[in-house]
Amino acid sequence: MSYFYRLKLMKEAVLVKLPFTSLPLLLQTLSRKSRDMEIKNYSSSTSGFILLGLSSNPQLQKPLFAIFLIMYLLAAVGNVLIIPAIYSDPRLHTPMYFFLSNLSFMDICFTTVIVPKMLVNFLSETKVISYVGCLAQMYFFMAFGNTDSYLLASMAIDRLVAICNPLHYDVVMKPRHCLLMLLGSCSISHLHSLFRVLLMSRLSFCASHIIKHFFCDTQPVLKLSCSDTSSSQMVVMTETLAVIVTPFLCIIFSYLRIMVTVLRIPSAAGKWKAFSTCGSHLTAVALFYGSIIYVYFRPLSMYSVVRDRVATVMYTVVTPMLNPFIYSLRNKDMKRGLKKLQDRIYR
C-alpha cells in the first residue's frame, strides 16, 4: 500500500471519528478565524481603525449593549432635566447653577461623543472607525472633557468666594465674569484639542490598525504608531499636565481655603451648613479626577488595557450618569426646581 494511499485512509478515519457534537465548536472556530482574517485584511488595506471594545467575547456583546444603553439614557435624561429645572426657577439663577447647567450640557455632549459609537460596535462584527472619524472623536472627547474640568474649577471658585468672601460675592461673581469664565474654559479646551489632534495626525501607522480600546484615546493610538513617539509622548504629557492639572490645583487650593475658613466658624451648625454646600461638588470632583489621574498621569510603558478601560468608563459614562443625582438628591433648591418643572409639564 502506497504512502499517499495510507495517508488518505488515516484522514478519512479521523473525519469519521470526529464526534458530531464537536461540529458546532469547529464551525464557531472557523467563523472566528475568518472574522479575524477580515479584520487583519481591513486594517492593513485601509486608513481606518478597528476598535476592539470592552470585551472580545461575543456572548457579552448584547448584555454590554443593554447595560451601556441604560447608562447612556440615564445620563442624557438626567442632565437634560437639570438644565430646564435651573432656568425655570428664578431662585436658581445664580453663578453656581449657571455653571451646573453648563456642566450638564457638557456631560451630555461628552457621553454622546463616545457611547453611541460604542453601542453600534457592540452589535457589529468589524467595529470599524475611519481615520477622520477617529481624529474627530479624539478632538471632541478632549474638548468636552477638558471643559468639564474647567467648569468644576469654576464651581470651586464660586464656593470659595461665597464662603470666604461673602460681602464681595455679587461683585466678583457677577454674570459678565461668569460668562467670561465659561468662554475661557471652552476656548482653552478646544485649543488644547486642536493641538493634540494636529500632533496625532503627523504620526504614521503601519501594519496594525487595531485599537485596544472602545474609543480613540491618545495612549492606545500612540501605541499603534510606527513613528518615533518619544517626543510626541513628552509633548502629550507636558500639555496634559498644563491643561488638566491647572484646574485640579485650583480646586484643591479653593477647598483648602474653604476648610481653613470653615474651621474658624464657632458654631457646629455653621460649620455643617458651610461644608454641606460643598459636599456634592467634592463628590463629583473625586469621581471625575480620580479616574482621569489614573489613566493619564503615568508613562506609556505602564499602560494596561483592562484597567484603563474600567477607569475610562468611570469618567466617560458613570460620572456623567451620576452627576444629576449627586447635585439634586441632597440639594433642596434643585429639588424645588425639578418639582416646579414637573408641575409645568403636567399642568
From Swiss-Prot:
Membrane topology type: Multi-pass membrane protein
Predominant subcellular localization, coarse grouping: membrane
Subcellular location: Cell membrane
Keywords, alphabetical: Cell membrane, Disulfide bond, G-protein coupled receptor, Glycoprotein, Membrane, Olfaction, Receptor, Sensory transduction, Transducer, Transmembrane, Transmembrane helix
Disulfide bonds, paired cysteine numbers: 134-226
Pfam families: 7tm_4
GO terms for MF: G protein-coupled receptor activity; olfactory receptor activity
Keyword Chaperone on entry: no
Glycosylated sites: 41
A GO-annotated cellular component: plasma membrane
Gene Ontology biological process terms from the UniProt entry: signal transduction
UniProt keyword Transmembrane, yes or no: yes
Family named by the database record: Belongs to the G-protein coupled receptor 1 family.
PANTHER family: OLFACTORY RECEPTOR
Name of the featured protein: Olfactory receptor 1L6
